[in-house]
């Protein structure tokens, strides 16, 4: 899995940063891409990346502010032109269905695929055999969600060396043993596949937050995450301003990462007041509290678990 930051700016696009959108690429895991927020011109950023809209399976909207949703109509239309024909699900606050449907209807846009809308409340919003996604309210004046994506633990690997040492030759029997089945060999021996399977592989946890000021719900959403993606609209000494505008600072994000025992913090949603050099200072500041911090730039790619 990898995170591709398509837009990392706050409020309005700047020369250095487009507005918010993050792609979670899971091509190896489920041959799919999930998108978190879709600010204006996100589809232009997609063209500059390796992301394929035909692989887009789900879109998660954190809140209904324009810098997080104005890119949706164009991106959804372009997905049709790029061969997307599988159903797409959009999760988000109340109003997301009306916004998308109205935009498409008034523009006369006809899609080649079906959109399913899930207007969510806090709790589990999606689960299958591979992933569990939960959401909770943040604090941004309008309803804003944070998302927690949990990859379920994977079965341990089959110990082929141990099987070989026990005189079991590779072949179709390996698949049965990998499934944990009890198998009778040609020589009459009965072996249990569970004795040859290693420890389960721990799944990854990714927490992606919408815009927010400091709030208590953040801690549970972020707890023990492999990656926490958090806004850092302002530098540390502007905490009062951040609170008034319902946003966060670098230090507030770093303190949360430390308290939640996350492995990596990625800062995004950077105000246009900070150019590239000033952004480096934001990173240095956050690292004084939480060392394993990165600051996202447009088109930056981060591997999950590294």
UniProtKB/Swiss-Prot annotation:
Note whether Metal-binding occurs among the keywords. yes
Q: Quote any Pfam family the record assigns.
A: Lactamase_B_2
Its top-level enzyme class, in one word, is hydrolase
Enzyme Commission code: 3.1.26.11
Against SMART domains, the record matches this protein to: Lactamase_B
GO MF terms here are: 3'-tRNA processing endoribonuclease activity; zinc ion binding
Cofactor(s) in the UniProt record: Zn(2+)
- Chemical reaction(s) catalysed: Endonucleolytic cleavage of RNA, removing extra 3' nucleotides from tRNA precursor, generating 3' termini of tRNAs. A 3'-hydroxy group is left at the tRNA terminus and a 5'-phosphoryl group is left at the trailer molecule
**Can you quote the record's cofactor note?**
Binds 2 Zn(2+) ions.
Per UniProt, subunit arrangement is: Homodimer.
Protein's job: Zinc phosphodiesterase, which displays some tRNA 3'-processing endonuclease activity. Probably involved in tRNA maturation, by removing a 3'-trailer from precursor tRNA.
Q: Which NCBIfam families match?
A: PRK00055.1-1 (NF000800), PRK00055.1-3 (NF000801), RNase_Z (TIGR02651)
Give the family from UniProt: Belongs to the RNase Z family.
Q: Which HAMAP family match?
A: RNase_Z_BN (MF_01818)
Q: What is this protein called?
A: Ribonuclease Z
Q: What is the lineage of its organism?
A: Bacteria, Bacillati, Bacillota, Bacilli, Bacillales
